[in-house]
Amino acid sequence: MGIAGSHLVAMGLLALTSQLHAQTTESKGTLTLEGAKAAAAAAAAEARKGNEGASIAIVDDGGNLMYLERMQPTFPMGAHISTEKARTAALFQRPSKLLEDAILGGRTSLLAVVPGPLQGGEPITVNGQIVGAIGVSGASSAARDAVIALAGAAALAGKPSAAR
């Protein structure tokens, strides 16, 4: 095989490799610290509407803590619980309430793998992609935890600047 033939083979392999690479990876947004703070601020504003405190945790899509705010008054354990609710919503890519319902419905084995199976964790979606999650604990009820979390998640919906 001559030099021209070798070049053709190399170019073909390069094209095939590029094509395979394009098929096995995709771009996705990443929640920014500014986005995490904006979600927490919206959640805190919702909590203040009800004159209540809450712990608000924001995690990235891998469940890693990005931002935590413990409003007053709320109990100290709320910081841990809110983080676990957020991790559950991020890692399972669904509201933590759905996992709580599954456990209450008899799927008790989920307790071994779900970090925070309580209402109040919501995925954060930007441009149709889950980029993180918010967890809230310590409001006046589990239902209020969820409402506050939804307010935080909704603050970033449709805001591509929250993810890079």
Where in this protein do the model-derived segments appear?
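N-terminal signal peptide c-region/cleavage motif recognized by signal peptidases
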Residues: 17-19
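Flexible, solvent-exposed loop/hinge segments and secondary-structure transition points
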Residues: 22-164
